[in-house]
C-alpha cells in the first residue's frame, strides 16, 4: 500500500462522530475541496470506500491528506465551511464568482448623493435598487432620472461649475449652498420611484407640463410629455408574479444523475426581473449543497439581500437563517407556493437540457474520433497529443502541446516548452527536442501514452518525431502531420511512411476536430511565445542599468508589465516598486534615452 493511503487509513480511525468541516489536500498540500458533515467519520470514510461517480472518483484520486475541524453544531459547520471556501478557493468546490453579477442602481451615502449604475454591492455605502435584467435597462433608467432630477454627477467635488450645471442636470453643490431639504426630498422621490412607486414622479411632471403649456412653452411641455411616456414604457407591468411590491428571491432546485440545478427568481415590484441558474456536481447531500450555495450566494457573492427569501418546504429553515440575514419563508399554499414550484420546475428543465446537450456533444466527439481512427486505419484515438513550435528567426523559440481526450480538450494535460538545445530557426530539431523531452518524462513518470501524436507540419516533422519515438525511446505510437493552406487554415492530415493524405471530407466531424486541435495548439504556442518574448525584451532593456539585478527585474516586471508602462511611470511610482531613489533616477534616464 502506498504511504499516503496508509496515513489516510490511520487518520480515519481517529476521526470523531461529531459535526464539523474537512479539508481535502493534494500532493502539493493544496486544499482542493472543503466539505461539512453531521458525522465527520461517516462522511470521510465514505470517500475512501465503495464506488463513486466520475466527479468524486477524480477528487478522491487527487487526495493525499485531509484535515478536519470539529464544531458544536451543524449550523456552526455551515458558517465555518463558507469561511474556509472563501479562504482557500478550492477548485473542487462550486465557487460563485463575482463575474456572475447583476447591475444595480445606487444612491450614494453622501451629503449630496449621486446616482450610479454598479455591479458591486458594498455594505453601508448607499442604497441599492435592482437587480436589473441587464446593463442597458439600468443605464436607461438612470438616464431618464438624470433628465428629471439634477443629481450631482462628479465623483469628487470640483472647485468650479461643470457642464451638467449649465444644462440643468446638476444643482451645483460644489459652488452654491444647495438647500439640503430640497436635495433630500429629491433623493426620496427617486428612491420611491426605484422601489416601484411612480405616482409622485408622474404627478410632478404633469404639473410641470401644465405650467409650461400655460406659459406657451410648447417645446418644454412636449419634453415633459415624452418623459411621462418614457416612465410608462419603463414601468409597464410584464407578467405579474406577485400581488404586492415586496422584493423577494425565490429558490427552487432539482437533482438528477449526480447533479443539482438551483434556480433563483428575482421578484421586484411584482415582476420577475431576472433569474439565475447554477449547476452543482453533488459531493454532499442535496440539502447540504443547498445550504452552502445560498450562503455563498449572499455572503461571498455580490447579491443584495431582499426583504424575503422563499425556499422549498423540505429544507431546514434554521440552517438557512444562520447564513442568510433576512426573512425566510417556506410557502405551503397560494401564489407564493406556485412561485417556488415554478422555480423547481425550471431547475428540472435546465438540468434536463444540460444532459441533452452533453449527450449531443458526446455523440459528436465520439463520432469524430471513431471516424478519424477508421480513416487512418488505427484504433480509436481516445487520447491525442498535438505539438506546435513558435519562434521569430529562432529567437525565444518555444513549443507547446495540447491534449484532447474523447475529442475534447483536457487542459490539465497541456504543456509548454522552452527550446534549450537548438541554435537558430530549426523547426525539425526543435520538434525532435520536444518529443524527446515529453515522452522521456512520460516513461519515467508512468504517465498515460497517447493513442495518436499530431505534429504541426508535414513529412519532415513527422519523420523526426517518429525517429525519436521508435529509435531512441522504443515507442510505437501513430504520428500524423497537419498541414495548413496558404490562408493558414487546416488543409489536410498526413499519415503513414510516405506521409500520404488521409481522405477526410472537409465537412466531417473528424475534420472539424482536427481544425479545433490545430487552432488550439497554435493559440497555446503563440500565447506562450509572446509572453516569453515580452519577458525577454523587458529584462534585456534592464541589463545595462546598474543596481537592477534579477530580483529587481522580476519585481519591475510584475509591477509594470512592459517597458512602455515603465517609461510612463513617475519617479515616485518607481520608488514605490522598491527601487532606491538613485537607481530609479538612473532607470528613468536610461529609458528616456531609448525613447
Swiss-Prot record:
Keyword rRNA-binding: no
GO molecular function: DNA binding; excinuclease ABC activity
Cytoplasm among keywords: yes
Major place of residence: cytoplasm
GO biological process: nucleotide-excision repair; SOS response
Subcellular compartments: Cytoplasm
InterPro entries xrefs: GIY-YIG_endonuc, GIY-YIG_endonuc_sf, GIY-YIG_UvrC_Cho, RuvA_2-like, UVR_dom, UVR_dom_sf, UvrABC_protein_C, UvrC
One cellular component term from this protein's GO annotations in UniProt: cytoplasm
Domain UVR residues, every copy: 199-234
Domain of life of the native organism: Bacteria
Record's keyword terms, sorted: Cytoplasm, DNA damage, DNA excision, DNA repair, Excision nuclease, SOS response
Domain GIY-YIG: 17-94
Pfam families the record matches: GIY-YIG, HHH_5, UVR, UvrC_RNaseH, UvrC_RNaseH_dom
Subunit structure and binding partners: Interacts with UvrB in an incision complex.
Family stated for the protein in its record: Belongs to the UvrC family.
Record function comment: The UvrABC repair system catalyzes the recognition and processing of DNA lesions. UvrC both incises the 5' and 3' sides of the lesion. The N-terminal half is responsible for the 3' incision and the C-terminal half is responsible for the 5' incision.
Protein's name in the database: UvrABC system protein C
Organism name: Staphylococcus carnosus (strain TM300)
Amino acid at each position: 500500500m502506498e504511504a499516503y493511503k496508509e496515513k489516510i487509513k490511520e487518520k480515519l480511525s481517529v476521526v470523531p462522530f461529531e459535526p464539523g468541516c474537512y479539508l481535502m489536500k493534494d500532493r502539493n498540500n493544496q486544499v482542493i475541496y472543503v466539505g461539512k458533515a453531521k458525522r465527520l467519520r461517516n462522511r470521510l470514510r465514505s470517500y475512501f470506500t465503495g464506488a463513486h461517480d466520475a466527479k468524486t472518483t477524480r477528487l478522491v484520486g487527487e487526495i493525499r491528506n485531509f484535515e478536519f475541524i470539529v464544531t458544536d453544531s451543524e449550523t456552526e459547520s455551515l458558517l465555518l465551511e463558507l469561511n474556509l471556501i472563501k479562504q482557500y478557493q478550492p477548485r473542487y468546490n462550486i465557487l460563485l464568482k463575482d463575474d456572475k453579477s447583476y447591475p444595480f442602481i445606487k444612491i450614494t451615502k453622501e451629503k449630496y448623493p449621486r446616482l450610479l449604475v454598479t455591479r458591486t454591492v458594498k455594505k453601508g455605502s448607499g442604497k441599492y435598487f435592482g437587480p436589473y435584467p441587464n446593463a442597458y435597462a439600468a443605464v436607461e433608467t438612470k438616464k431618464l432620472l438624470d433628465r428629471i432630477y439634477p443629481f450631482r454627477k462628479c465623483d469628487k467635488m470640483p472647485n468650479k461649475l461643470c457642464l451638467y450645471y449649465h444644462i440643468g442636470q446638476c444643482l451645483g453643490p460644489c459652488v452654491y449652498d444647495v438647500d439640503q431639504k430640497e436635495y433630500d426630498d429629491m433623493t426620496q422621490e427617486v428612491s420611491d420611484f426605484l422601489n416601484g412607486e411612480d405616482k409622485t414622479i408622474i404627478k410632478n411632471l404633469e404639473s410641470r407640463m401644465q405650467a409650461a403649456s400655460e406659459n406657451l412653452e410648447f417645446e418644454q411641455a412636449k419634453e415633459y410629455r415624452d418623459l411621462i411616456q418614457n416612465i410608462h414604457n419603463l414601468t409597464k407591468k410584464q407578467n405579474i408574479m406577485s400581488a404586492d411590491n415586496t422584493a423577494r428571491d425565490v429558490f427552487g432546485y432539482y437533482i438528477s444523475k449526480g447533479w443539482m440545478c438551483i434556480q433563483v427568481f428575482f421578484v421586484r415590484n411584482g415582476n420577475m426581473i431576472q433569474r439565475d441558474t447554477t449547476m452543482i456536481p453533488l459531493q454532499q447531500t442535496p440539502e447540504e449543497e443547498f445550504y452552502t450555495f445560498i450562503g455563498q450566494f449572499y455572503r461571498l457573492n455580490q447579491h443584495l439581500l431582499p426583504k424575503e427569501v422563499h425556499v422549498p418546504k423540505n429544507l431546514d429553515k434554521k440552517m438557512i437563517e444562520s447564513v442568510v440575514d433576512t426573512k425566510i419563508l417556506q410557502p405551503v399554499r397560494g401564489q407564493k407556493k406556485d412561485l417556488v414550484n415554478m422555480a423547481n420546475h425550471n431547475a428540472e428543465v435546465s438540468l434536463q437540457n444540460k444532459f441533452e446537450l452533453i449527450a449531443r456533444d458526446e455523440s459528436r466527439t465520439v463520432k469524430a474520433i471513431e471516424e478519424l481512427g477508421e480513416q487512418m486505419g488505427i484504433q480509436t484515438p481516445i487520447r491525442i497529443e498535438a505539438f506546435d513550435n513558435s519562434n521569430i528567426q529562432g529567437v525565444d523559440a518555444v513549443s507547446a502541446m495540447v491534449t484532447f481526450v474523447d475529442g475534447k480538450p483536457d487542459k490539465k494535460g497541456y504543456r509548454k516548452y522552452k527550446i534549450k538545445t537548438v541554435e537558430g530557426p530549426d523547426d525539425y530539431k526543435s520538434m525532435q527536442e520536444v518529443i524527446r523531452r515529453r515522452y522521456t518524462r512520460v516513461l519515467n513518470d508512468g504517465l498515460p501514452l497517447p493513442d495518436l501524436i499530431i505534429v504541426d507540419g508535414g513529412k519532415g516533422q513527422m519523420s523526426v518525431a517518429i525517429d525519436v519515438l521508435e529509435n531512441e525511446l522504443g515507442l510505437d505510437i501513430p504520428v500524423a502531420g497537419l498541414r495548413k493552406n496558404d490562408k493558414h487554415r487546416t488543409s489536410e492530415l498526413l499519415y503513414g511512411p510516405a506521409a500520404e493524405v488521409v481522405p477526410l471530407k472537409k465537412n466531417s466531424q473528424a475534420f472539424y476536430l482536427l481544425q479545433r486541435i490545430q487552432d488550439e495548439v497554435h493559440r497555446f504556442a503563440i500565447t506562450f511565445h509572446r509572453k516569453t518574448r515580452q519577458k525577454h525584451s523587458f529584462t534585456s532593456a534592464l541589463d545595462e542599468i546598474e543596481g537592477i539585478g534579477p530580483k529587481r527585474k522580476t519585481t519591475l516586471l510584475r509591477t509594470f508589465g512592459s517597458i512602455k508602462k515603465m517609461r510612463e511611470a513617475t519617479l515616485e511610482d518607481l520608488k514605490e516598486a522598491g527601487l532606491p531613489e538613485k537607481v530609479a533616477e538612473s532607470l528613468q534616464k536610461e529609458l528616456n534615452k531609448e525613447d
